[in-house]
């Protein structure tokens, strides 16, 4: 069987280890069956004013969001999800005014604690960016601690009670939070679809490597247009 340059067949070995197949050959591409509206949900990750708004803590991430068109693309995809009857679930980072219940056991959380902006529930800082609403039928799941949204929240039972088997993961950042969300979803048996134009991280060259070598092994990577088309079939 002919081979293309730079690819390996299953069972090939390098230095005695079994090589992986190219990512594109290992992930499902039948989006019609993977993304049936009755069994899929759109998850947004920390698309909040204090995270990706104009005065957010990490300017480089805000710039990446702007460059990618994430807010516009995700706002449009959320509208298509609602129109198709697909639940939209917003995962929010929240903090009490006194910081109670939130640890600083890693550098990322410690940086957040030192910020003058407090993500108090109901505050403008904790609010979703305008492109995402929320609309009355949306779900909002907050967490006081940690860097990803499944642990210690209602996210898992909400999805299971809605009959969801595939989650479409969007938001920020590909560096940490989205990665935690994707891994936890896989651990819980969900299929994961990742629209590349609805996620962002920094720096760009690292994001490209993450998508190819990490997310490509965990999720079906597509565009928001492909997701919307599958929901409209």
Enumerate the language-model features and the residues they cover.
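Aromatic- and acidic-residue-enriched segments that line the glycan-binding/catalytic groove
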Residues: 99-113
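Active-site-adjacent betaalpha module
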Residues: 2-41, 76-84, 109-233
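Short acidic, Gly/Ser-rich segments with clustered Asp/Glu that frequently serve as metal-coordination loops
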Residues: 48-53
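Von Willebrand factor
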Residues: 73, 77-100
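Short glycine-enriched, charge-decorated loop/helix-capping segments at active-site entrances
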Residues: 57-67
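Nucleic-acid-processing active sites and adjacent nucleic-acid-binding tracks
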Residues: 70
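Short, solvent-exposed loop/turn and secondary-structure capping segments
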Residues: 54-55, 101
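N-terminal nucleotide-binding beta1-loop-alpha1 segment
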Residues: 43-47
């Amino acid at each position: 069987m002919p081979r293309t340059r730079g690819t390996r067949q299953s069972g090939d070995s390098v230095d005695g280890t079994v090589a992986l197949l190219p990512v594109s050959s290992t992930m499902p591409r039948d989006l019609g069956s993977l993304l049936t509206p009755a069994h899929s949900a759109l998850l947004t990750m920390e698309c909040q004013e204090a995270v990706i708004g104009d005065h957010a803590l990490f300017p480089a991430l805000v710039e990446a969001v702007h460059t990618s068109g994430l807010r516009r693309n995700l706002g449009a995809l959320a509208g298509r999800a609602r129109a198709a009857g697909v639940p939209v679930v917003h995962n929010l980072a929240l903090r009490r005014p006194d910081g109670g219940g939130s640890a600083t056991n890693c550098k990322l959380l410690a940086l957040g604690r030192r910020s003058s902006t407090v993500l108090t529930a109901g505050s403008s800082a904790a609010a979703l960016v305008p492109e995402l609403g929320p609309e009355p039928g949306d779900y909002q799941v907050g967490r006081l601690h940690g860097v990803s949204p499944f642990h210690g929240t209602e996210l898992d039972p909400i999805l299971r009670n809605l009959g969801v088997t595939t989650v479409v993961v969007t938001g920020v950042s590909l560096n940490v939070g989205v990665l935690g969300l994707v891994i936890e979803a896989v651990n819980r048996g969900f299929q994961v679809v990742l629209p590349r134009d609805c996620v962002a991280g920094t720096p760009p060259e690292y994001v490209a490597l993450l998508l190819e070598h990490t997310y490509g092994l965990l999720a079906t990577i597509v565009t928001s247009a492909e997701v919307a088309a599958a929901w409209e079939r």
